[in-house]
Amino acid sequence: RGEVYLPKAGFHKLNEERAAEGLPVFANPRNAAAGSVRQLDPRITAKRPLDIYIYGLGWAEGRTMPETHSETMKYLQSLGFRINPRNALAKTIEEAEAYYANWEEKRNGLPYEADGVVVKIDSLALQEELGSVGSEPRWAIAYKFPAVQGTTRLKEISVSVGRTGTLNPVAILEPVSVGGVTIRNAALH
């Protein structure tokens, strides 16, 4: 398992090339990476400067499996897979909290966009014992950084009709850029 991402430098270069070709530019690296992975033409995807960090191993036939997640990461790295060099093993809750606080402060200096930190139980046996609920593991939790915010003005409130005929209020906003995405409307609940 792993996560495909688009480094910020590659994102800027890709957008420069797209603009020069008269194509629409991507809003942000995360959306560009997600769209690239879903791209129906693999030749287009192959031309994009995507990268990947591996964070898990399902099963390796004929080999004794590591007992911990941290050992798994070392094993995968020894095979030549790219592992995030910022991974760390925290032995206490306080160490995990300090790790989160450190990266919350440094997130804008990372070569890729990050929206939080994932904390996992290191023991694979304990991970197995805890299991998952649906696709959500009970042995890992994502601590998200505070959301990027923007300020704008409410121009008006309109009403849209939902697919079941319900009337839904919608805020019409002065456009504001938040995380590289221009927001013009917002659902009101």
Question: Where are these predicted regions, by residue range?
Answer:
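RNA/tRNA-interacting regions in translation and RNA-turnover enzymes
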Residues: 1-189
